């Protein structure tokens, strides 16, 4: 029996089957990515209590900005490499990969230095409670040191996906997640290193996955290329072209994360009890939205490859397939969360000793958002199509509108309805972003039929 090829050919065949097949490893990879980020919270919270849980939660709001830059660089890289792949341009694929790896490591080194130096001032700016600020700063400094590993892995995973291979990143994430869990248990539980131990566990797991993914990618793209296509190790022209994609994605991801920081500062004054419940529920929410983000990334790669191959008529069907998949996932998530939300909360908190306000906050967060994930799925699929088409300014402006509205909504209502204003602002922002994107896209298509799919 022949093994299925690792790379999914997206320019031929049934779009629904292609999207479903390609999205599945991406969904599981994203879930493991979230597990990777979440095990610190679970193990620290269960072993060291609510204050340690809150410290990791506050730190995570800051690390999301760092993750955003790495993710944005990966997204921008993925779109361009997918276009090169669709056009069959191996020389540009190789040049693009080596160029972005060099550039991303330089950016990562800068972010690492800034993270180590400015951890404490930033946490003070966010009004972090004094009883957790030292632990949060320790976690943040150690996490910052791992930026080169994070960038290296994110860019390489995006390249694999752009080439139609979503399985390799998934396998690497499974390995990395298991390593992270093992070192978390060893450092936090065995050596009693607390919050710092969780940060070191993440550092080591990221390093291993980054090195292995580098070896696999260079072996696949460079050593096993029998055609020996000529390429430049570093190209200013390719970097400029890639930057036009990556810069918008980095800005968009950073805007989202900075917005989360601002929103986080609305939660912090409620105290460590509410913050612990919010942190636990936000981790569960992060798992819930991962499949929709994966579907958006699948649509982005699918769209870019078909655009590069000149098969614009296939793009509409890919978008519709992603929306259908997201709808099914949203229904399942609603049922699971409503049935098991208290048990999920128990993964992060000791419900027998946690305060009533912490539990009430977490339960309220999960219950309210369970009704709204279908909106997230539709919006993510549409944004993925926009990225694949190269409509990056429209995508960016929609994200800015989303976050701006979320911030206004939160601060306008937090004194009226309490901390629930923070999470209720999310679906409101998704709706506004989708409406803006649809209207903007139709206007753009009337001016210039850039993709031939205006009637979506």
Where in this protein do the model-derived segments appear?
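Short alpha-helical transmembrane segments in multi-pass integral membrane proteins
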Residues: 1-23, 81-146, 190-247, 303-371, ...
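N-terminal transmembrane alpha-helices
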Residues: 10-47, 61-76, 80, 105-112, ...
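Transmembrane helical elements of multi-pass membrane transporters/channels
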Residues: 21-40, 142, 153, 176, ...
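Helix-terminus/linker motif at the lipid-water interface of multi-pass membrane proteins
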Residues: 31, 35-53, 123-130, 186-193, ...
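Small-residue-rich hydrophobic transmembrane alpha-helices
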Residues: 53-113, 150-169, 277-341, 376-390, ...
């Amino acid at each position: 029996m022949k093994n299925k090829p690792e790379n999914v050919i997206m320019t031929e065949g049934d779009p629904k089957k292609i999207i479903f097949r390609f999205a599945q490893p991406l969904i599981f990879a994203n879930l493991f990515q979230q597990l990777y980020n979440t095990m610190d919270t679970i193990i620290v919270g269960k072993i060291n209590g609510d204050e340690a849980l809150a410290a990791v939660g506050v730190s995570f709001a800051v690390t999301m900005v760092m993750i955003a830059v790495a993710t944005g660089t990966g997204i921008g890289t993925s779109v361009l490499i997918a276009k090169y792949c669709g056009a069959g341009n191996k020389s540009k694929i190789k040049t693009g990969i080596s160029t972005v790896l060099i550039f991303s490591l330089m950016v990562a080194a800068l972010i690492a230095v800034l993270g180590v130096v400015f951890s404490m001032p930033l946490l003070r700016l966010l009004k972090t409670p004094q009883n957790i600020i030292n632990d949060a700063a320790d976690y943040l400094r150690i996490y910052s040191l791992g930026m080169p590993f994070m960038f290296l892995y994110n860019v390489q995973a995006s390249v694999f996906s752009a080439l139609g291979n979503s399985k390799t990143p998934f396998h690497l994430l499974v390995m990395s997640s298991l390593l992270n869990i093992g070192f978390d248990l060893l450092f936090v539980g065995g050596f009693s290193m607390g919050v710092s131990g969780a940060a070191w566990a993440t550092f080591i797991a990221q390093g291993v996955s980054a090195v292995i993914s580098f070896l696999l990618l260079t072996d696949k793209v460079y050593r096993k290329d029998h055609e020996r296509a000529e390429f430049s190790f570093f190209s200013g022209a390719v970097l400029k072209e890639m930057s036009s994609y990556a810069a918008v994605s980095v800005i968009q991801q950073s805007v989202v994360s900075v917005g989360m920081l601002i929103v986080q500062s609305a939660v912090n004054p409620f105290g460590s009890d509410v913050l612990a419940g919010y942190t636990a529920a936000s981790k569960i929410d992060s798992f819930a939205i991962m499949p929709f983000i994966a579907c958006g990334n699948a649509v982005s790669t699918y769209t870019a490859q078909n655009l590069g191959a000149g098969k614009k008529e296939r793009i509409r069907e890919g978008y519709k397939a992603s929306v259908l998949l997201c709808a099914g996932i949203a229904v399942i998530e609603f049922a699971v969360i409503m049935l098991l939300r208290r048990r999920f909360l128990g993964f992060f908190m000791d419900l027998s000793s946690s305060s009533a306000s912490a539990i009430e906050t977490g339960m309220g967060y999960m219950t309210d958002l369970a009704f709204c994930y279908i909106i997230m799925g539709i919006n993510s699929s549409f944004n993925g199509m926009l990225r694949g088409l190269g409509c990056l300014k429209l995508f960016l402006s929609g994200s800015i509108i989303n976050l701006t509205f979320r911030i206004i909504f939160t601060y306008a209502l937090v004194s009226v309805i309490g901390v629930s204003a923070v999470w209720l602002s999310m679906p409101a922002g998704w709706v506004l972003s989708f409406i803006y994107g649809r209207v903007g896209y139709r206007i753009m298509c009337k001016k210039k039929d850039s993709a031939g799919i205006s009637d979506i």
